[in-house]
Amino acid sequence: MLLIPAIDLKDGQCVRLKQGDMDQATVFSEDPAAMARHWVEQGARRLHLVDLNGAFVGKPRNEAAIKSIIAEVGDEIPVQLGGGIRDLNTIERWLDDGLSYVIIGTAAVKNPGFLKDACSAFGGHIIVGLDAKDGKVATDGWSKLTGHEVADLARKYEDYGVEAIIYTDIGRDGMLQGINIDATVKLAQSMSIPVIASGGLSNLADIDNLCAVEGEGVEGVICGRAIYSGDLNFADAQARADKLRDGQ
C-alpha cells in the first residue's frame, strides 16, 4: 500500500482545506520545500501536490513553490501534481521540470479527447483525479457537480492507458471521518485501472482497512489533514502498511 503525503498549495503556502472550501484553509507551512523534505525523512515514497489556486482558475498558479519541491526531493521520489492542468503544453512543461506524474481532473471529465491525447503523448505519466459527492463527479475545484456517476466515467478511461485514478470523497475530505472504503472498493472492482483512495484518512484503522482491500485494486492512499494535525503519525502508518504487506 502506497501512502502518499499531500501538499496542498495556496498562495505559495502549504495548507489544508475542509471539503475543498478555499475559505476554510489552515496554513501548515510557509516553506513547501521544507515540508516535502520532512515527509521524505518520514519515509514517504511519493508526494501528492495540489495547486489549489490553479484548480480554480484552470492554469498553474503556484509554480515557484512546486519547482522548489521538485528541486528538493524530485531526484529521490516520484512527485505528482494536480490542479490547473488542462492542456498538453502544461503537461509537457511540468514533466520536463521533473514531475513524474500529472493529475488531470476537470479536463478529463469535460474533454475526454484531451485525456486520450495526453495518455498517447505522455504514456505512463497520466493519472486521473475523480472527485465525487454522493457518487456524482464534481469539477472546477469541486465547485460544480455533474450528473456523471464515478464508475461509469472511470470505465470509459480503461482503454486510454491511464496510470491510476485518484478517487476523492469530497464529503469526507479534511473531516477525519475515515476513508469511504465501500465506495473506493466498488470503484476499483468495476474496472482494471488501479485506484488511489483520498478523502477522510484519519487513523491506523483506516490503514488496516485499506491494506485488507489492496488485492481488490486499491494501490494507495493520499494522506492529508490527519498527518498534519497529528491524528496520524505518517512514519507509523507506513510501517504498519509495510508489515501488513509482508504478512506480519
UniProtKB/Swiss-Prot annotation:
SUPFAM superfamilies: Ribulose-phoshate binding barrel. One of its GO terms (cellular component) is cytoplasm. One of its GO terms (biological process) is L-histidine biosynthetic process. It is found in: Cytoplasm. HAMAP family: HisA. Its main location: cytoplasm. It comes from Cupriavidus taiwanensis (strain DSM 17343 / BCRC 17206 / CCUG 44338 / CIP 107171 / LMG 19424 / R1). It catalyses: 1-(5-phospho-beta-D-ribosyl)-5-[(5-phospho-beta-D-ribosylamino)methylideneamino]imidazole-4-carboxamide = 5-[(5-phospho-1-deoxy-D-ribulos-1-ylimino)methylamino]-1-(5-phospho-beta-D-ribosyl)imidazole-4-carboxamide. InterPro entries: Aldolase_TIM, His_biosynth, HisA_bact_arch, Isoase_HisA-like, Isoase_HisA-like_bact, RibuloseP-bd_barrel. Keywords: Amino-acid biosynthesis, Cytoplasm, Histidine biosynthesis, Isomerase. This is 1-(5-phosphoribosyl)-5-[(5-phosphoribosylamino)methylideneamino] imidazole-4-carboxamide isomerase. Its EC number is 5.3.1.16. It is an enzyme of class 5 (isomerase). The active site is at D8, D131. One of its GO terms (molecular function) is 1-(5-phosphoribosyl)-5-[(5-phosphoribosylamino)methylideneamino]imidazole-4-carboxamide isomerase activity. Signal peptide: none annotated. It comes from the Bacteria. Pathway: Amino-acid biosynthesis; L-histidine biosynthesis; L-histidine from 5-phospho-alpha-D-ribose 1-diphosphate: step 4/9. The gene is hisA. Belongs to the HisA/HisF family.
